[in-house]
Amino acid sequence: MKVVHLVLSNSFAGIEQHVNELLININNVDTILICNDSIEKNFDSRISTIKIKNIGRRSFFGKYKLKKLINNIAPDIVHTHGSKTTSIVKSINKNAYK
């Protein structure tokens, strides 16, 4: 199973620390973390990361690039962390949560 975790915040705080600890301790699952380039260096080096530039809720080009990246990875699950990340992913996937 392949799982993509998304963290699009600008600072490394509670959610990001939780994701860091979660991904270090997950076994037998192929996990990839997509995160903001400004916080990528704070995650443990054992975590497979893809850094992206900051994406705003209204950034059409940023959303397009994120959707293309997720489609290229072809995960079984996309796990969002944080309300901003969830709203961005929901807006690029009109079939989410139905």
Task: Put a short name on every predicted segment.
Residues T80-T86:
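Short His-centered aromatic/hydrophobic patch
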Residues K2, D76-I77:
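Structural motif
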Residues I70, A74-D76:
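Proline-aspartate-enriched helix->loop->beta-strand connector
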Residues L33, V78-H79:
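Conserved SAM-binding loop
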Residues H5-G62:
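N-terminal strand-loop element at the rim of the active site
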Residues V3, K94-K98:
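Active-site proximal beta-strand in glycosyltransferases
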Residues K63-K67:
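Short hydrophobic/charged patches on amphipathic alpha-helices used for structural packing
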